[in-house]
Amino acid sequence: MNKDEIKNLTALEAESELEWLAKEIARHDVLYNRDDQPEISDAEYDALRRRNAEIEALFPELIRSDSPSHKIGAPVSEKFEKSVHAQAMLSLDNAFSSEDICEFIVRIRRFLRLPATQILEMTAEPKIDGLSLSLRYEKGRLVCAATRGDGYIGENVTANARTISDIPKVLRGEFPDIIEVRGEVYMRRENFQALNMSQQEKGKFVFANPRNAAAGSLRQLDPRITASRKLHFFAYACGEVSETFAASQMEMMKKLKEYGFFINPLTKSFKTLEEIISYYHDIEECRHSLSYDIDGIVYKVNDLKLQMRLGFVSRSPRWAVAHKFPAEKAMALLEGIDIQVGRTGALTPVARLAPITIGGVVVTNASLHNEDYIKGIGHKGESIREGRDIRVGDTVIVQRAGDVIPQIVDIIAEKRPKGASAFVFPHLCPACGSHAVREVGESVRRCTGGLICPAQAIERIRHFVSRNAFDIEGLGKKQVEFFFHIQDEALCIHTPADIFTLQRRQEKALVRLENMEGFGTVSVRKLYNAINMRRKVPLSRFLFALGIRHIGEVNARRLAHAYQNYTAFETVAMAATMPYDKVGEEGNEAWLELTNIEGIGPQVGEAIIDFYQEAHNREVLAALLREVTPLDEENVMTASSPIAGKTIVFTGTLARMSRDEAKALAERLGAKTSGSLSKKTDLLVAGSAVGSKLAKAQGLGVEVIDEEAWLQLIEGSYI
């Protein structure tokens, strides 16, 4: 959508577009910042943010409370302790042309009211494509290392950071009592290639690029793994400091080097726009000769007092900007289209290319995104590439942007061979043969064989045993992978039922489990006890554990409350499939009954139908139900509940229960829960280490209580 198209939007269209953008950008923030698994290139992500900003500029009255313009990064993972940043760890605004940089400098001069004759000195440094890290030193000793997280709360990765040789454990020379040093953790290309070769030889996960490898390596639960990954660190700024120790950005860098940090040797200062742009082009030209990936240049006002005067906007400093490199392109022959099945069942087309070199990297595969993209249709149903589809045998234009997975952006129509036929996207999963369905409004086709599909199996079993599902202690990620890959059929776990037959089957094992490395008599006994304790679970947990698309904890509880027992639910789910096979009153009534439950609409109903229509899933379910019993759901009376009908938001860390447990409890007592604050919020329950929600709640006039008051409020209302 270009600027002219944005200007023609109605208020209703703009509101719908902003809602979609908020959700889409938030999803990609989590994929990039928390999961280290980006689906789109930096250029595509930047385009989404630009579109959001342009629509907000035209319709300021429609700016949402969850607008991406106000957010940084993504929420932290539950795997790590949280660490509150003493000074917010913001991201940078992006620029894409010399004109953008000129405007950036003009804005600074205007804000500071600088006369045209006054020189504005700027620093320039390569923008390292890695993971931002904040290092806190007290009395010269490293006491905390934290990732950016959402900009206010990060993940405490101190133990892992200590294994990186570039990060000093004790500072040298004279330094402030308290100093937070910000910088970038990265992996050199040669180390990245060696790591991937090692991963491949061991049959383990292969990283898409050095940035993902660095982020994944730093965020390991075992510091020994981080230590083995050869990570590096460049310092580029400071957060909180107890005393001033430099007058300029360049002096700060010099001091940090004296303290023992590595500073990028390409960092320089300039006095004119022409010098800055010349530096940008020089670095762009030689970027592939560097030992690490960069995706642009960062410019900063050199004078630290001017930085203080300029301050910040909602998610970035006024005194700095990232000048991004353009995407690199090349032509290639499309030799084939392969379909990969992801851990969530999504069928993703991948282009097989005749080898080409883009930016010094040999490319043989490229992303084709989804079924519509191949046909020449965009995410909103609009025509892309002037409606040209992509066919095997085409000469295609491949783009590599931000050092993420390359993608095909267009074809050379005149080079299409005669007889090239349109690509037919499969309707059956290539991994298990189950039906692959595409929901209305979705661009992705997904495998419905969730409980049987080998491509999804490990992730499905991990979900099945997770804390909010069957909650089986002793079956973590490593154990699930061990039992899935083991060659002995007497010990393998490929379906949920296999978990509950393991103890019986192991009698026929070639080697008993307690005699294997990593296990022992005590740990095996504990594992079997944990499994047997979960042979009876509440219906809501059972439904959630099945991993049916759109059936999260909330919808699982809704269905459990509506049907009370599994037999009643299964009867309706099976009956609702009947309209697919025959037209009948029973089927139609079952469909209406299912989809008229509050919060359960056609989209969720279709997901349930798809799941129960698949014979593979019914077979796996039947085997599971021979081993476990879903307990009937008890009605929860909410008439006397003090929070019935109220909208509640939870923030911070709760001591007596997890936030998920608190939300579930509130909903059982008749309240609605939300992840974001608005004027409709009745109550904010604040734990420790709260972020920005507290101030926002006070601004909106929302009542705020702590965890103790929350427990007193609901005392006697639940068992």
Curated annotation (Swiss-Prot):
Known InterPro entries for this protein?
BRCT_dom, BRCT_dom_sf, DisA/LigA_HHH, DNA_ligase, DNA_ligase_AS, DNA_ligase_CS, DNAligase_adenylation, DNAligase_N
Name the catalysed reactions: NAD(+) + (deoxyribonucleotide)n-3'-hydroxyl + 5'-phospho-(deoxyribonucleotide)m = (deoxyribonucleotide)n+m + AMP + beta-nicotinamide D-nucleotide
What cofactor is needed? Mg(2+); Mn(2+)
GO process terms (BP): DNA repair; DNA replication
Q: Where does NAD(+) bind?
A: D42, A43, E44, Y45, D46, S91, L92, E125, R148, E184, K300, K324
Q: Name one GO molecular function term.
A: DNA ligase (NAD+) activity
The record's keywords, sorted A to Z, are: DNA damage, DNA repair, DNA replication, Ligase, Magnesium, Manganese, Metal-binding, NAD, Zinc
Does the keyword field hold Magnesium?
Answer: yes
Residues binding Zn(2+): C429, C432, C447, C453
This molecule's function is given as: DNA ligase that catalyzes the formation of phosphodiester linkages between 5'-phosphoryl and 3'-hydroxyl groups in double-stranded DNA using NAD as a coenzyme and as the energy source for the reaction. It is essential for DNA replication and repair of damaged DNA.
Give the record's family classification.
Belongs to the NAD-dependent DNA ligase family. LigA subfamily.
Q: What is this protein called?
A: DNA ligase
Q: Which organism is it from?
A: Bartonella quintana (strain Toulouse) (Rochalimaea quintana)
Q: Which gene encodes it?
A: ligA
